[in-house]
Amino acid sequence: VGNLYDDPRYSAKRDSAFSIFYMAINIGAMYAPSAATAIANWQLKKNGFFYDANIPSLANEFLKNPDATGDMASKLEVLANAQGWTGNIADFASSYINSLAGSYHMGFAVACFSLIVSFAIYLGFKKSFKHADVTSKQQAAVAAAKGEKVVELTKEQTKQRITALILVFVVVIFFWMSFHQNGLTLTWFARDYTSNAAEGLTRIGFSLPMMTCIVIAMYSLFSTIQSTAKKTKLISGGVLALMVILCIVFYTNLQPSTHIEPQLFQQFNPFFVVLLTPISVALFGALAKKGKEPSTPKKIGLGMLIAACG
């Protein structure tokens, strides 16, 4: 897909296109924690259970040491009673883990199905970008056939570009190391050290309908401001007003206390990526018009600094 932006007419749009692509990935990531929880509950319900993030680790530890007594056994017994279990604790631990394992299989099946759909879309629309689906050798062959001169990089130019790539790779590797460790650590921290209930305004962050409305409202606001067509402005303004009304309705219908599963904290990062994408696109677009847009490596560096501050 990146080859589409090798065309000089579109080269300046490459970073904006990537922002939109990355935003689309994060739309899925925003809904993934709730979807995973729903799949787990659907599978567990078959055996009369519901998902509780505190059970899997305790159940596995208990199965490793079934003769254990004391705090661990007491905690597991309390959790088992909350699930409506009145039998042997060891049987509960085994039954719960086996039932939960089925949800992992189901989750993997959903991911596989998504890949099949993605591949079908790729094949179905391949004709629309067939001209860009070529290798460097194929591009060179086409240019030679047209009698165009193929410019080859000198050894020094190649060395400079490889050095630049290695430097970017180093930065990106450390970024993703911190990114993924942060996500896993955040889930564990949420499980062990945060409240499992939200009250007041914090409930908004655990309500997907409200978060969805906020995102749509943000895009409607930008469309209202940036659009030059009166009809588009009116439609965007109407959508914005509708989202505000829906947010109010959803908020007034929230329970006084919202139960939180630890994995739901994972939806915050993609939510803010999706929410702030139009701001970043507008910012860099404005800088590009003034000829002041930073290069891609500089943007990566700024991202690393922001991540470090976080």
Residue ranges of each PLM-predicted region?
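Transmembrane alpha-helical cores of Major Facilitator Superfamily
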Residues: 19-27, 267, 271, 305
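Hydrophobic/aromatic positions within or immediately flanking transmembrane alpha-helices
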Residues: 105-109, 266, 300
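Cytoplasmic loop-to-transmembrane helix junctions
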Residues: 9-24, 103, 295-302
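Transmembrane alpha-helical segments of major facilitator superfamily
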Residues: 205-215, 265-277, 307
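Intracellular loop-helix junctions on the cytosolic face of multi-pass helical membrane proteins
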Residues: 6-11, 15, 37-257, 280, ...
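A gly/Pro-rich, aromatic-decorated transmembrane alpha-helix motif that marks the paired
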Residues: 27-42, 309
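Hydrophobic/aromatic residues within the transmembrane alpha-helices of Major Facilitator Superfamily
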Residues: 27, 173-177, 271, 309
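Structural signature of the two symmetry-related core transmembrane helices
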Residues: 275, 295-310
